[in-house]
Amino acid sequence: MNKKLIALGLSVITALTLLSGCGGEKKAAVPAKNDLKVTYVKSPLNIPSIVDKHNQTLVKEFGKDKVTVTFPEINSGAKQTEALASGSLDVCSALGGTSAILAASNGVDVKVVGIFSRAPKAFNIMVKDPAIKSAADLQGKKVAGPKGTILHQILVAALDKANLKPTDVNFVSLGIPASVNALMSGEIDAALVAGSDVLRAQKAGAKVLCNGEGLVDATIVIGVSGKMLKEHPEMVKKYLAVHQQNIDFMNKETEKLMALRRRKPVLPLTR
């Protein structure tokens, strides 16, 4: 996986290089694009997306060019890349690096154009049984979570650190909310959890067994299709510039940001 992460980093450099040089080539005329479909990812809750939704930054900036921005709500990384491949999505605003790697290895033409965040502490393995004190105690247990994601990668890394293999647990592929529900009902022994569902699980009596710190870097990326990058590079550049506006708001408008954080149960975001 480390080699794949290096490849992911190289793909970012490659995509940014393509963007920086997009103005110098003569290309065949491409019809103007008057819409932009950007995922709004709620789980885990991430501050730049919340800031953008509150301030309507993308809508206002692209509106100046008469471009309509819509925000399909897709939390699953796999479903984001599926939508990208089908052409029903233009920008994966917050895509797990693991999901990007798996999609690319399966032939999806996804291009990483930026790093959204790195927040390993936001991704957790949670349990309810007090007898489970470490990853080693997961041997033979049933664990649920979204397959092929950063959370899944953390599970594999935690097991490896405990000298266990992925096959030493009974893994069930479920979404995060369903995994928490299964943990609370006793159907499984451990759940892979992120976002506001961590707080929900804790309120119901679950505890964090471990998080991604020291196991993975938990890179969340911004992805577009190769076609989008090739045909509409200026839109991609503008998207990244507007995203930076949201980051600048986070850094400068501390009081307003805290007010937004109080409205939603947001986990810390490390850039």
Q: What positions do the PLM features span?
A:
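Short, low-complexity disordered leader/linker segments with a strong preference
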Residues: M1-D35
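Flexible hinge/capping segments at coil-to-helix
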Residues: A29-K33, V127-K142, M228-K237
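Extracytoplasmic "Venus flytrap"
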Residues: P31, D35-H54, G148
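A local structural motif
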Residues: P31-K37, K60-E73, S88, K161-S173, ...
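Short, polar/charged alpha-helical segment
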Residues: S43-E73, A78, L102-N106, Q153-D160
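Short helix-initiation/N-cap motifs at beta->coil->alpha
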Residues: F71-E82, L95-G97, L164, V169-S185
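Alpha-to-beta junction loops
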Residues: A85-L95, V108-V110, K141-K142, M184-V193, ...
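Pocket-lining segment of extracytoplasmic ligand-binding domains
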Residues: T98, F171-V172, P177-P265
